Amino acid sequence: MNEIAKETNENATQATTGNKLIHEVGEEAKNGNEQMHNMIEAMNDINTSSHNISKVIKVIDDIAFQTNILALNATVEAARAGAHGKGFAVVAEEVKNLAEKSAAAANETAEMIQSSIDKVEEGVKIADETAASLTKIVESLENVVEIISSIA
């Protein structure tokens, strides 16, 4: 009889210890899940910011395009002016070169930003999947906690 009582006490002690540990694991899983959701929110903010920067780059590209057209028009007018328009033609050519450099830089920047946007979107997708898995783990742990609590 003493042996049965001893075994029962040991089982109760182990169940209590298991209950305590499973509660701790559950809290850590909830904490991890919350941190995952915070990360997803931050990544969404980065994504929004990248889209806004893309809009600014588009405006810069449009300005470069318009400047290039103005430079071409100025070159035509300089040619019409003949010898008197040579100095103006040089300035128009420099403006054209500057517009082309601006357009190239805007395009390169837009490509880099789009690459970042794509990577952030992929990261958000992975983080969402991870968060869903963590949520399932938390739910499963809560079920285990209930079972162990009823035993302890």
Could you tell me what each predicted segment is?
Residues 15-25:
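Membrane-proximal coiled-coil signaling linkers
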Residues 1-13, 27-34, 41-69, 75-150:
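Parallel, heptad-repeat alpha-helical coiled-coil signal-transduction segments
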Residues 21, 39-42:
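Generic hydrophobic, aliphatic-rich segments that mediate packing or membrane embedding
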